[in-house]
Amino acid sequence: MHNQSPIIRRKSTRIYVGNVPIGDGAPIAVQSMTNTRTTDVEATVNQIKALERVGVDIVRVSVPTMDAAEAFKLIKQQVNVPLVADIHFDYRIALQVAEYGVDCLRINPGNIGNESRIRSVVDCARDKNIPIRIGVNGGSLEKDIQEKYGEPTPEALLESAMRHVDILDRLNFDQFKVSVKASDVFLAVQSYRLLAARIDQPLHLGITEAGGARSGSVKSAIGLGLLLSEGIGDTLRISLAADPVEEVKVGFDILKSLRIRARGINFIACPTCSRQEFDVIGTVNALEQRLEDIITPMDISIIGCVVNGPGEALVSTLGVTGGHKKSGFYEDGVRQKERFDNEQMIDQLEAKIRAKASMMDESNRIAVNLLEK
C-alpha cells in the first residue's frame, strides 16, 4: 500500500493528443505502435482494439503512402484510442491524414521538404489543433550531423532535435513533444537529460529497437527507469520485437514499479525456496493471467512461508503467507481469521481479489460523486 511516489516530475508545457493530456503534470501516457500493414485495415483495427483492452493511451500507425493514408481514414473510424500518424518525406500524406482526423503527427520537419512544405503542414496542424511529435533517432541522424560527430552521441541527437525545434519555433508553433531515441541505454539517457535542460515541451521516452520481449524489456526498464526516476518523461513507448500488447504491459509495469502511475495489480511474490508451503510460482502465473482485466490499483503479496510473508502482507491490499496445508490471509495489513486451503489457493485468492477490486471501485465512485456535489 505504498501510494506516494517520491519522484518530482520535470515541469513541461501541456498539449493534448486527442483527449489525452500530455505534460504539465498529466499522467504519463503509455503508447504503442501497430506492426501490421496499415493497408490491411481489418488486421490493424484488430491490433489496436487488442491494445485498447490492455489500457494503451495512444497508438502510433505508420503511414508511408497515400494508400496507407486512405486506410488510416477507415481505421480511425473504427477505434476509440487517439492515433498518431508516423510520416516521413512526403508532406502531402500529413495534410491528407489531417483531414481524416489524426490526433498527432509524428514528423521531423527537416525531412519533409522545403520551408513552404513545412509551413503548409504546420499551418494545417495549427488550424486543426493537431500536435506534432519530433522524433529523433540515433540510427537516422542527418548526414551533416553524422559527419560532424562521426557517430551518434548525446550532443549529436540534441543538435538534431534542436534543429527541428527551431523550425517550429520560427513558425510560432508550440504544440509539440520531442523524443531522442537510441538503442544504447547510456546514449538515450544522456540525450534526454540534455534535451530536458534545453526545452520545456513534453518528452516522449523510448529505447528504440530495444530487442525481443525479454532483453528489450530489461533495456527499457533500465533506461526509462533512470529517466523517470529523475522526473523526465511525459509519454513512453517500450519498443519490442514482440506483440505490441507486451509493450503496453511492460510500460505500465515500469510506471507501477516507480509508483508514478498505478493500473492493475502489483504482485509481490517470493522467488521460492524449500520453505514454501504452496506452489507460489504456479499461483502467481495463474493469477496474472486470470486477473489481466482488473485495472484497480492493488498490491497483492503472495509469499510461500512465514519468514517474510507477514511483513509483506502488512503493506499489501491483500496478502497470503504460506502455512502447513492452510495459509494465512491478510486484508489491508490485518490478519484475518479465514485461512486458505493451499490446494485451492488460486481460486480462493482470485475471488477475494475480484471482490476487493469491486469494493474499492465502488468506494471511489461514491467519493467522486460526493466531490462533484
Curated annotation (Swiss-Prot):
Entry keyword set: 4Fe-4S, Iron, Iron-sulfur, Isoprene biosynthesis, Metal-binding, Oxidoreductase
Domain of life: Bacteria
Pfam families, per database record: GcpE
Pathway entry: Isoprenoid biosynthesis; isopentenyl diphosphate biosynthesis via DXP pathway; isopentenyl diphosphate from 1-deoxy-D-xylulose 5-phosphate: step 5/6
Note on cofactor: Binds 1 [4Fe-4S] cluster.
Catalytic activity: (2E)-4-hydroxy-3-methylbut-2-enyl diphosphate + oxidized [flavodoxin] + H2O + 2 H(+) = 2-C-methyl-D-erythritol 2,4-cyclic diphosphate + reduced [flavodoxin]
A Gene Ontology BP annotation from the UniProt entry: isopentenyl diphosphate biosynthetic process, methylerythritol 4-phosphate pathway
Secreted recorded as keyword: no
GO molecular-function terms, A-Z: 4 iron, 4 sulfur cluster binding; 4-hydroxy-3-methylbut-2-en-1-yl diphosphate synthase activity (ferredoxin); 4-hydroxy-3-methylbut-2-enyl-diphosphate synthase activity (flavodoxin); iron ion binding
Its EC number(s): 1.17.7.3
Needed co-factor(s): [4Fe-4S] cluster
Binding site for [4Fe-4S] cluster: 270, 273, 305, 312
Xref: InterPro entries: Dihydropteroate_synth-like_sf, Enolase-like_C_sf, IspG_bac, IspG_bac-typ, NO2/SO3_Rdtase_4Fe4S_sf
Transit peptide is among the record's keywords: no
Family matches, as HAMAP family: IspG
Family that this chain belongs to: Belongs to the IspG family.
Its biological purpose: Converts 2C-methyl-D-erythritol 2,4-cyclodiphosphate (ME-2,4cPP) into 1-hydroxy-2-methyl-2-(E)-butenyl 4-diphosphate.
UniProt name for this protein: 4-hydroxy-3-methylbut-2-en-1-yl diphosphate synthase (flavodoxin)
Organism from which the protein derives: Serratia proteamaculans (strain 568)
Higher taxonomy: Bacteria, Pseudomonadati, Pseudomonadota, Gammaproteobacteria, Enterobacterales
Encoding gene (name): ispG
